[in-house]
Structure formats: structure tokens, C-alpha cells
UniProtKB/Swiss-Prot annotation:
GO terms for molecular function: translation elongation factor activity. Keywords: Cytoplasm, Elongation factor, Protein biosynthesis. This is Elongation factor P. It comes from the Bacteria.
Length: 186
């Protein structure tokens, strides 16, 4: 159990059978009446954000999360197979469990898997990854100044908007949080 007075950004709690992460919190001490804690909570499973108010000192069940470092080894019949780097156990995850990050998974890539009571809650990919451009419109000389973008398909099948000067075969860095181009990789 954790007191609402001890809430911090990133604290995980259990409410109504779901795991929530505290995104924002504010301790309010009105001149009249009792103090309370106003929070903004994000569901770890669905990503929904709700606002909830707790009485000061109210006890809430703290969610104990485990973080496991896994390496993506291969894909078999629609499931992504990962290997635990310490125990060498295999774990199978569906693309629904991985979420939108499945389009960036490459063999040999290491990810962090967040577990709660043995159940996968979320898969954390590296913030930036380097991938090869496999398909895009050809770049034309002098396209660097206009600042335009074009779609490019990467080696994993993901589609990202890249500058006009990027051509097929180049290695680029991509931000996995918002699917954006970060730059060329040398």
C-alpha cells in the first residue's frame, strides 16, 4: 500500500483492476476543509488518461512492476519470439501485445518488457533505432534546400516520412515514439 501523499510522477498504482501510472499530481491544501491530492493517471494497458482526486493520506494499492530485458530472435506464425538475456527462456508475444512498436522489430534487437503478476503490460523499444531504407522515390540533385518530405519504407516494413535527399539503401535513425526521421546514420 502507498499513501496518496507519497505519489510522484511515474508511480504505478492499482485501481479498479487496472494498473495506472501517475502522470501529474498536485497536493492541494484549501483554507477550509481537508487536504487532497489531484492526479492525472494513465492506464498502462490502454493508454487512457483520467483525472482522479484522492484524500490526503488515503492508502492505495501500489502496483509492483517487473522489467525484463529480452532480445527479439525470430517471428513464427504471427508471434514474435523473444529470449530472456539472463535465463535464456523464450517468450512469445503477439503483435497486439507489442503494440505499434512491432513494425520496428528487427532480429537481435533488445527490448524491455514490463510485467505485472506475470502478464505483459507493455513493450518498451529503444527510443531511436537505425534502419535501412528499402523503398522510396529517387532523390534529385538540389533537393536539400526545399525542406520537403517523402514516404520511405524501411527494412522492417515501417513507413516514415524522410527528407527528399534520402535514397534507397541509406541507413537512417528513426524515433520509435512518434515515427519521425532523426537523421542519417554513418
Amino acid at each position: 500500500m502507498i499513501s496518496s501523499n507519497d505519489f510522484r510522477t511515474g508511480t504505478t498504482i492499482e485501481l479498479d483492476g487496472q494498473v495506472w501510472r501517475v502522470v501529474e499530481f498536485l497536493h492541494v491544501k484549501p483554507g477550509k476543509g481537508s487536504a487532497f491530492v489531484r492526479t492525472k493517471l494513465k492506464s498502462v494497458q490502454s493508454g487512457n488518461v483520467v483525472e482522479k482526486t484522492f484524500r490526503a493520506g488515503e492508502s492505495v494499492q501500489q502496483a509492483i512492476l517487473e522489467k525484463s530485458n529480452l532480445q527479439h530472435t525470430y517471428v513464427e506464425s504471427g508471434d514474435y519470439v523473444f529470449m530472456d538475456m539472463t535465463s535464456f527462456e523464450e517468450t512469445r508475444l503477439s503483435s497486439e501485445q507489442i503494440g505499434k512498436g512491432s513494425k520496428y522489430l528487427k532480429e537481435g534487437m533488445e527490448v524491455n518488457v514490463i510485467l505485472h503478476n506475470g502478464k505483459v503490460l507493455e513493450v518498451e523499444l529503444p527510443i531511436s533505432i537505425t534502419l535501412k531504407v528499402t523503398e522510396t522515390d529517387p532523390g534529385v540533385k538540389g533537393d536539400t534546400a526545399s525542406g520537403g518530405t517523402k514516404p520511405a519504407i524501411l527494412e522492417t516494413g515501417a513507413q516514415v516520412m524522410v527528407p527528399l535527399f534520402i535514397s534507397v539503401g541509406e541507413m537512417i535513425k528513426v524515433d520509435t515514439r512518434n515515427d519521425s526521421y532523426l537523421g542519417r546514420e554513418n
